[in-house]
A protein has these predicted regions:
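Vicinal oxygen chelate
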Residues: 1-33, 38-51, 74-126
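Short hydrophobic/aromatic beta-strand micro-patches
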Residues: 9-11, 60-64
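Short active-site oxyanion
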Residues: 56-58
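Beta-hairpin (beta-strand-turn-beta-strand) motif
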Residues: 62-66, 103-105
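Short amphipathic alpha-helices within nucleic acid-binding modules
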Residues: 66-73
Length: 126
């Protein structure tokens, strides 16, 4: 299995510039544009994501196969496609969340925002 660093996600309670809102997840996301790929996530009450994802930082890795990456692990976010061509899942390991991403999209497509339009995670984006 090949693990390639993708980003770090940090929960925050602070409103940050450039936030995108995800109504299905009751979550705001900002950051990620810099080469360090640090994202910030702010959650509303009633967010359906696992409490570990809402309270602890996570590291995300691109993998060749999400199914292989999560096999036998404590899955806290079942595999799904937040937007076309981008499959995500998360596990808990030693009390910390780890996200896995399986995609053929380029980094520009992912971070540029065009892939998000009218997606599961951002259904109302333009």
């Amino acid at each position: 299995m090949n693990y390639q660093f993708h980003h770090v996600g940090i929960p925050t309670t602070e409103v940050r510039p450039g936030e995108r809102y995800s109504a299905p997840f009751k979550m705001y996301t900002s950051g990620g544009e810099a080469p360090t790929r640090i994202q910030y996530h702010r959650f509303e009450e009633g967010c359906p994501l696992h409490p570990l994802l809402q309270t602890k930082p996570h590291v995300a890795f691109k993998v060749d196969s999400i199914d292989e990456a999560i096999r036998g692990k404590n899955v806290i976010l079942e595999p799904y496609f937040p937007f076309e061509g981008f499959k995500v899942a998360a596990i808990e390991e030693n009390g910390w969340p780890i996200e896995f991403i399986e995609t053929s999209l380029s980094e520009e497509e992912i971070w540029g925002g065009s892939a998000y339009k009218n997606s599961v995670i951002y259904p109302e984006s333009e």
